[in-house]
Design a protein with these regions (language model features):
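Short, aromatic/basic amphipathic alpha-helical patches
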Residues: 52-55, 72-84
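Consensus positions within tandem repeat domains that build extended binding/scaffold surfaces
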Residues: 2-7, 26-29, 53-55
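Structural signature of tandem-repeat unit edges
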Residues: 9-24, 34-50, 60-70, 85-92
Length: 92
């Protein structure tokens, strides 16, 4: 996802990253998204994703859904651990 890809898109409530081969979230990609409620990431290993700076900015609180069994890995992964309380398991 490019830098500032969804920056300021206040009307978007849910984003799904369905490709398990996804590798990067750019700087401020999801910043200033006041209505965002849910981000689904279908990537089991957080180490597979490189993160830009300030990816969520001041978007407020929302849930980040990751594959079953991956919540713990995301909660302690570098770059993701600051959002530990946001993570939930995806249900299929």
């Amino acid at each position: 996802i490019a830098d500032k890809a969804f920056y300021g898109k206040g009307n978007i409530k849910r984003i799904q990253i369905l490709n398990s081969n996804f590798v990067h979230i750019g700087n401020n990609a999801f910043s200033q998204m006041g209505e965002l409620e849910r981000l689904d990431i279908h990537v089991a290993d957080p180490q597979q994703l490189s993160l830009g700076d300030n990816i969520f900015g001041s978007s407020g609180y929302f849930n980040i859904y990751v594959p079953q069994g991956s919540v713990g890995a995301y909660q302690i992964a570098e770059g993701w651990s600051q959002y530990a309380e946001y993570f939930r398991e995806l249900e299929f």
